[in-house]
A protein has these predicted regions:
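Short, acidic/polar
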Residues: 24-33, 165-173, 226-232
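Short alpha-helix in the alpha/beta-hydrolase fold that links the catalytic acid
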Residues: 57, 117-118, 228-232
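N-terminal pre-triad scaffold of radical SAM enzymes
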Residues: 1-11, 83-113, 122-133
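Short beta-strand elements of ligand-binding domains
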Residues: 64-77
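Glycine-rich, charge-decorated loop segments at or immediately adjacent to ligand/cofactor-binding or catalytic sites
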Residues: 76-83, 253-258
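A structural motif corresponding to the C-terminal lobe/cap of the Radical SAM core domain
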Residues: 175-176, 180-182, 189-286
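A short, structured N-terminal alpha-helical element that caps or precedes a catalytic domain
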Residues: 1-67
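Core AdoMet radical
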Residues: 5, 40-48, 107-201, 210-222, ...
Length: 286
């Protein structure tokens, strides 16, 4: 069975093989599918604001005359098995599904129901798990062992939950020598765990100057202000993490242009890295 995968938009995590397509079918796309004897078309939708576009793609790809299916995270399809390279670029992997938390701004709880499902561990270097620190000790150790074998330095893009990090996990992460690991500062309750996480990671051997420790900072939601958001971003630097502003977007994907401008000042690596370096240099001078 050969599956053509279709995506409403192309991202840095999209697969790059010959049967990964973006948008409506072109004559060349159709020819490629016929040549490869494609038997199914899967339209994968990550963002809810792309659902309408996916509906158009569903009808457009009927031209191949093979079954067309629509699914993906936008439809709360998050707890299934994982096949490397199918819907994500090679190297991007899930080793578990689900999360134990129930964050108001996140769609994962709708399908995870507070549970984490451990998956067979496959080779890869970019860990996308929603809550890998919530997996069993045996699973976490096995994932780290796998990462040590990879030629590419690992990245924990899915994020590490500050409140769950234990010192042995921090020590093991340091042994893996990741290029970057990400955590999140989403609500006020996250600050103290974030500070403690920074202490544990530094105790393990991580240094702020390496820019390995990174943190997504949610901003732009109802009731937020530029002053409060900037305060959280500074607090993130104080905890030892390079901050990256993450703009809140509702089900329709809309956002305030003013917040978008604010986010840009705090999401580009060159800018945030410079702000972070200036902050830590000032701290060392005092």
């Amino acid at each position: 069975m050969k599956i053509a995968r279709v995506f409403p938009r192309k991202t840095s995590m999209s697969p790059t093989d010959a049967l990964a397509f973006f948008g409506p079918p072109t004559i060349e796309n159709i020819a490629d599918c016929i040549k490869e004897n494609v038997t199914e078309v899967h339209i994968s939708v990550t963002f809810t604001w792309d659902i309408e576009k996916a509906e158009d793609l569903y009808y457009a790809w009927q031209i191949l005359g093979v079954p067309v299916e629509v699914g993906g995270p936008a439809f709360d399809d998050r707890m299934g098995d994982f096949t490397p390279g199918l819907y994500l670029r090679d190297g991007m992997i899930f080793t578990s599904r689900g999360c134990t938390k129930d964050c108001w701004f996140c769609s994962v709880p709708r399908c995870a129901h507070g549970e984490i499902k451990e998956l067979p561990i496959v080779d890869g270097w970019n860990i996308l798990d929603d809550n890998i620190l919530g997996t069993s000790e045996a699973h976490f150790r096995a994932v780290c062992d796998m990462l040590k074998r990879q030629k590419h330095r690992s990245v924990f893009t899915g994020g590490l939950e500050p409140a769950l990090l234990q010192q042995w996990q921090a020590d093991l992460l340091y042994e893996v020598k990741p290029a970057r690991l990400y955590t999140a500062y989403d609500t006020r309750d996250d600050l103290e765990p974030l500070i403690e996480m920074g202490k544990k990671l530094r105790a393990a051997g991580f240094r702020p100057s390496s820019h390995t420790m990174c943190c997504y900072v949610l901003c732009g939601y109802d009731g937020d202000s530029f002053e409060d958001a900037e305060k959280r971003l500074v607090q993130t630097m104080q905890a030892g993490f390079v901050p990256y502003a993450m703009l809140f977007r509702g089900e329709d994907g809309k956002y305030d242009p003013e917040w978008r401008r604010f986010q840009r000042e705090w999401c580009r690596p060159i800018i945030t890295g410079k702000k972070f370096n200036e902050y830590w240099l000032a701290q060392n001078d005092t």
